[in-house]
Amino acid sequence: MDNDDNENQIISMKIPLERLGVIIGKEGSVKKYIEETGQCGIIIDSETSDVFIEQKGDPLKALAAAEVVKAVGRGFNPDRAYSLFTENYQLIVMPLREVARKGSNRIKDIKGRVIGREGKTRRIIEDLTDTMISVYGDTVSVIGDYVSVKYAIEALQMLISGKKQRTVYAYLEERVRDLKMEKLNENLS
């Protein structure tokens, strides 16, 4: 078989079985939207939880589609994940297993700290950094523009390392001005 440079690229990933239905959506609506917007085809193997994204048009749009699928797999609502089709938006997935010993309750504790009482901590970080955060399985994931994600990740790392919530809030409130200035400079350049 010839190796043609124009050959369509296929990206594969494993998605938790319970999230496959969300990727498909009601009457296939989510899958169809991702395929159309991402100029790709999506094949889902429900037995193995494998998802294949085949580039059909613009390779950057197909990569964005793969990030959308990954985000939905990491617990994001599809409407939130669609923001990854926006230029300069990214998904960062932080695995919590790296900071917790196997078999410990540390992951559960960290997830509780990130979410906060009735979702308060997550909401405050999202509001102050203009990002979206999902806590799912053994991961914490963030969607936002490059600048915003940087600040959200810093705040999350502070929480994960054991800093008090109020310390993280105070840090973020101090950094909000820096964040706005960085975004302004990014938009001007």
What are the residue ranges of the model-derived segments?
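RNA-contacting regions in translation and RNA-metabolism proteins
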Residues: 1-189
